[in-house]
């Protein structure tokens, strides 16, 4: 039986912390879908298409990882993809309460959907896409927190904005 996991998020932009989680998930499961949410309510800096393209570029070396955009309920997307494992990253205890609520709602919507929580490597445990964008907006160096291609795209987007 093949085990397909989904690692969902907005990934605006995809950080080294996200890359750490998807890489580790790729070693744990037969296949992983990096599912990029449209998330229009969050007003992403990058379009869904741009986020999907960047994610495909930085995960190209992970042969069992596919990247898809989605705009429906996660449980419905998981069902459509034939996946019953949801991978989520936990950086701090403060993430846990929200993730617990999401896991319970997803299980209510799809009883066979299990949530698996991974902690990022310590080097990435304090990073969030929002924090990285804020640092970059104020002229800080974010190269250590993002894959090279993503850092370039972020700096170009902010410069051209």
UniProtKB/Swiss-Prot annotation:
Pfam families: CTP_transf_like (PF01467). The gene is coaD. Belongs to the bacterial CoaD family. GO terms for molecular function: ATP binding; pantetheine-phosphate adenylyltransferase activity. InterPro entries: Cyt_trans-like, PPAT, Rossmann-like_a/b/a_fold. One of its GO terms (cellular component) is cytoplasm. Its cofactor is Mg(2+). Pathway: Cofactor biosynthesis; coenzyme A biosynthesis; CoA from (R)-pantothenate: step 4/5. Keywords: ATP-binding, Coenzyme A biosynthesis, Cytoplasm, Magnesium, Nucleotide-binding, Nucleotidyltransferase, Transferase. One of its GO terms (biological process) is coenzyme A biosynthetic process. Reversibly transfers an adenylyl group from ATP to 4'-phosphopantetheine, yielding dephospho-CoA (dPCoA) and pyrophosphate. It is found in: Cytoplasm. This is Phosphopantetheine adenylyltransferase. Substrate binds at residues 10, 42, 74, 88. SUPFAM superfamilies: Nucleotidylyl transferase. It comes from the Bacteria. Its EC number is 2.7.7.3. PANTHER family: PHOSPHOPANTETHEINE ADENYLYLTRANSFERASE. ATP binds at residues 10-11, 18, 89-91, 99, 124-130. Homohexamer. Gene3D superfamilies: HUPs. It catalyses: (R)-4'-phosphopantetheine + ATP + H(+) = 3'-dephospho-CoA + diphosphate.
């Amino acid at each position: 039986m093949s085990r397909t996991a989904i690692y969902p998020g907005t990934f605006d932009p995809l950080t080294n912390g996200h890359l750490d989680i998807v890489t580790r998930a790729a070693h744990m499961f037969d296949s992983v879908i990096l599912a990029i949410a449209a998330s229009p309510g969050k007003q992403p800096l990058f379009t869904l298409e741009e986020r999907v393209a960047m994610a495909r570029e930085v995960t190209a070396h992970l042969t069992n990882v596919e990247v898809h955009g989605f705009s429906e309920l996660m449980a419905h997307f998981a069902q459509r993809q034939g996946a019953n494992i949801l991978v989520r990253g936990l950086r701090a205890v403060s993430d846990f309460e929200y993730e617990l609520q999401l896991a319970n709602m997803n299980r209510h919507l799809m009883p066979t959907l299990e949530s698996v929580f991974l902690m990022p490597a310590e080097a990435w445990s304090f990073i969030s896409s929002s924090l990285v964008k804020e640092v970059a907006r104020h002229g800080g160096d974010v190269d250590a927190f993002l894959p090279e291609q993503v850092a370039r795209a972020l700096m170009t987007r902010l410069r051209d904005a």
